[in-house]
């Protein structure tokens, strides 16, 4: 939950940039004048369902230009499907209730495949003779294979087991290297930008007690 907290709040300046637009107007405009009218028509109906269910009043339906709501920036359909009434007041209120917002974010991450207790990002050391074509999120191998290729954990040992991971190099071969585990996919599903997802995942590891990652040393080791 601590990792999710930063992912949620850091995405929008800790809730400072949630938007100030009436999402009914935003979604109605996008449903009429957009390259994805079917998508936004469904989101407009999702916004109506939120009000019908009693979660928010029409004047509280404030978000960004794309119709995303509150500090979590959920689409209305996500809000309706994954919203959680964590504070027990009888309605899902991600606008005013921090417990509801955080629990809903965790619920959405779970839908993206998040597995509690499993790793998401681990700093590693990569040998110079590494088959670099195997790096990238599109390539997944068991940790045992990464170990055979000479990849080692930056701290501790890298188990030679069957847990799949991808090698990502955010700053290229000469920068820090990481194994991204299946839980990292949940960050990518939330925001497909690798820089954003890696940063959020990194701060998540820091909140979980991990030391700072290295900055690279100018050459593979």
What do the predicted segments below correspond to?
Residues 181:
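Acidic/histidine-rich, surface-exposed loop or edge segments in extracytoplasmic proteins
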Residues 168-170:
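Alpha-helical and coiled-coil interaction segments, frequently adjacent to or embedded
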Residues 215-221:
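Solvent-exposed beta-strand motifs enriched in subsets of small alpha/beta binding domains
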Residues 1-164, 175-178, 188-214:
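Catalytic glycan-binding domains that act on GlcNAc-containing polysaccharides
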């Amino acid at each position: 939950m601590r990792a999710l907290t930063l992912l949620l709040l850091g995405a929008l300046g800790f809730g400072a940039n949630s938007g100030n637009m009436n999402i009914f107007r935003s979604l109605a405009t996008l449903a009429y004048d957009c390259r994805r009218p079917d998508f936004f028509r469904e989101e407009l109906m999702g916004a109506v369902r939120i009000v019908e269910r009693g979660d928010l009043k029409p004047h509280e339906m404030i978000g960004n230009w794309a119709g995303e709501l509150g500090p979590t920036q959920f689409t209305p359909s996500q809000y309706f499907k994954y919203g959680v009434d964590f504070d027990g007041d009888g309605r899902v209120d991600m606008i005013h209730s921090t417990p509801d917002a955080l629990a809903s974010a965790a619920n959405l991450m779970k839908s993206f495949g998040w597995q509690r207790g499993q790793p998401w990002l681990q700093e590693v050391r990569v040998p110079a003779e590494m088959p670099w074509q195997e790096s990238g999120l599109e390539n997944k191998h068991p940790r045992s294979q990464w170990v055979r290729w000479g990849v080692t954990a930056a701290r501790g040992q890298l188990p030679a087991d069957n847990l799949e991971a991808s090698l990502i190099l955010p700053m290229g071969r000469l920068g820090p290297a990481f194994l991204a585990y299946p839980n990292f996919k949940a960050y990518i599903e939330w925001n497909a930008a690798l820089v954003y997802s890696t940063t959020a995942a990194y701060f998540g590891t820091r909140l979980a007690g991990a030391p700072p990652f290295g900055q690279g040393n100018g050459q593979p080791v």
